[in-house]
Amino acid sequence: MGTTIELAPGMTIGDPATVLAAIEHVGRPDLRLTVDTMHWGRSGYGAVELYKLGPEKIGYVQLSDTTLKARAKSYLQEAMYERMIPGDGELPLAEMLAAAPGDVVIGLEIPMRGLAESGVGPMDRLRPCVAAARELCNR
């Protein structure tokens, strides 16, 4: 069973160098990075930094999209409650996915509280997310 660590803005592991240092410090091949595309992109990183880490260091991808600049006053609130469908934002998602290993597990982390509160049901929120993720993965 593998373990992953996640980079997030303003947290202890907040940049690729710290990710790599943590993985090397632990010294286990089953410790890898979870790439949360929102956190990665909003931290100013893209596919280039993922390629530099190497696909063997990537263990999981949490896929969502967002704008490059904040859409809410609180980053935490935006990350927890209002992410965007893959392809609806500004992140270089196709390039990020290309840097990941071909067999990486990809999960969707796309909370949409505003839509839920406006009466849009879970399946109607989920369908476009799954369709967009499939399209990205099939490129």
Segments (PLM) and residue ranges:
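Histidine-acidic metal/acid-base catalytic patches
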Residues: I13-V35, G41-R139
